[in-house]
UniProtKB/Swiss-Prot annotation:
This is Alpha-amylase. It is an enzyme of class 3 (hydrolase). Disulfide bonds are present. InterPro entries: A-amylase/branching_C (IPR006048), A-amylase_C (IPR031319), Alpha_amylase (IPR006046), Glyco_hydro_13_cat_dom (IPR006047), Glyco_hydro_b (IPR013780), Glycoside_hydrolase_SF (IPR017853). GO terms for molecular function: alpha-amylase activity; calcium ion binding; chloride ion binding.
């Protein structure tokens, strides 16, 4: 029901433009995301939130009201962005925080509303003490979650001190329904549901059952919102991400975990031959997948040193390329900003650092440079050639199955997607090149490697490859090359 992302045409990839301003996202939809084939943007939470010391990124995950006003802009700017992006063929998915309000502090939110997390007063909604879980429903002494595998505790107690809303209450549900319907009426395509694991599936079902159909100005009649859930599997039998697959897709954390394990060199690459449901993952149609996220990059989920983020560009590009080449789930590409990563005792002491901003905390605008990089400290992974060209690869591969699998029994693999696209990856540990005559599945001709370059005016700015009449080619990926993979598709054929 809530599984369709409503991509336009054969677009198939979402990017998370973390903490970008709405005006900048609108520009990016028109100037880059639309033309380069991205299907949608996940935007950071849009509702009024707490203003915390030092302005950390996670203040956006501490709601104060459901008014649309954040550091990214106000409701008018948000509406304009949604319209511009839809027109450019790019959908908008809003990160929604329904599980809780703020932490214990009191103060003012980004739309000027006062709140008090100690007395549980949020007049901007309004919510009061009766709208939160207390000792009557949370089994722990301090109202905090300690045992994440106990459903009652994980869903009725406080996640890291955040005030836990009583979603069994009709009043609370209706306030949340009104907020989501307001966003739907503006023209969003759906939502990332934050902390779904900590909300009862039946409460979410009740809320979703009242959602409007998507706005007919941008979507076909009777379209339902796309919803994908942050479901972190804590082990134990208590909570299972499968409880949420009737409510939308789940963010399949096992995908990130298994792929990272392989690309870190803990498991051989050739194991990925049957990667997917046979590994215990949910069916492809129930999954949204990622390599990196706003949490993973700083170790708020997973482990630092294990997670792959923008500081390991070569590895991140290779793992992302596999994700985009493999026919599983809806992939999401992280787009982050620079922070000074300092790891002490397995923790990043700067894991709180917010987006590039001026001394008054105003987020700085993104102005891409002619070479596709971004200004200030915006990293813009979604603009890296290796990534945007793999977005195109996925578009061209469409629903074609994986064919022509080859591996060396270790850390070199290659496969095609039907007869439309082909990729080869070399992560061999002992400085070994991948040099092999392989079946590419491609029609005869000369192809431009879309990883080392682009095809511009029928000329390749990178390496090229010749495919013979049998679909075979001499494939080469040196162990010390800038990128650990090559990729070809029928849209990058050099016409002779």
């Amino acid at each position: 029901k809530y599984h369709n992302p409503h991509f336009i045409g054969n677009r198939s990839v979402i990017t998370h433009l973390m903490e970008w301003k709405y005006d900048d996202i609108g520009d990016e939809c028109e100037r880059f995301l639309g033309p380069y084939g991205y299907g949608g943007v996940q935007v950071s939470p849009v509702n009024e939130h707490a203003i915390l010391d030092r302005r950390p990124w996670y203040e956006r995950y501490q709601p104060v009201s459901y008014d649309i006003r954040t550091r990214s802009g106000d409701e008018q700017q948000f509406r304009r962005m949604v319209k511009r992006c839809n027109k450019a063929g790019v959908r908008i998915y809003v990160d929604i925080v329904l599980n809780h309000m703020t932490g214990a502090q009191s103060g003012k939110g980004t739309n000027g509303h006062h709140y008090d997390g100690n007395t549980l007063q949020y007049p901007g909604v309004p919510f009061g003490p009766n709208d939160f879980h207390g000792h009557e429903s949370c089994p722990t002494q301090d109202l905090e979650i300690h045992d994440y595998t106990n459903p009652k505790e994980a869903r009725n107690c406080r996640l890291s001190g955040l005030r836990d809303l009583k979603q069994q209450s009709e009043y609370v549900r209706q306030k949340q329904v009104d907020f989501l319907n307001h966003l739907i009426d503006i023209g969003v395509a759906g939502f990332r549901s934050d902390a779904s694991t900590h909300q009862w599936p039946d409460d979410l079902r009740s809320i979703y059952s009242r959602l409007h159909n998507l706005n007919k100005e941008f979507f076909p009649e009777n379209s339902q919102p796309f919803i994908y859930h942050e479901t972190i599997y804590y082990g134990g039998n208590g909570i299972n991400s499968n409880e949420y697959t009737s409510l939308g897709r789940i963010i399949e954390f096992r995908f990130y975990k298994e792929i990272t394990n392989v690309f870190r060199g803990n498991n051989p690459l050739h194991w990925l031959k049957n990667f997917g449901t046979e590994w215990g993952l949910v069916p492809s149609g129930d999954a949204l997948v990622m390599i990196d996220s706003h949490d993973l990059r700083v170790g708020h989920t997973g482990k630092l040193g294990f997670n792959i983020n923008c500081f390991e560009g070569r590895l991140l590009k290779a793992a992302t390329a596999f994700m985009l080449a493999w026919n599983y789930g809806v992939p999401r590409v992280m787009s982050s900003y620079f922070w000074n990563q300092i790891i002490k005792d397995g923790k990043d002491v700067n894991d709180w650092v917010g987006p590039p901003s001026d001394k008054n905390g105003n987020i700085l605008s993104v102005h891409p440079n002619p070479d596709m990089t971004c200004n200030h400290e915006w990293i813009c992974e979604h603009r890296w050639r290796e990534i945007y060209n793999m977005v195109k690869f996925r578009m061209i591969a469409g629903q074609e199955p994986v064919h022509n699998w080859w591996d060396n029994g270790d850390y070199q693999i290659a496969f095609s997607r039907g007869n439309r696209a082909f990729i080869a990856i070399n992560l061999q540990k002992n400085q070994q090149n991948l040099q092999q005559k392989l079946h590419t599945g491609l029609p005869a001709g000369t192809y431009c490697d879309i990883i080392s370059g682009n095809l511009i005016d029928n000329k390749c700015t990178g390496k090229s490859i010749h495919v013979d009449k049998n679909g075979q080619a001499d494939v080469y990926v040196g162990h010390d090359e800038f990128d650990a993979f090559v990729a070809y598709h029928i849209g990058a054929r050099i016409v002779s």
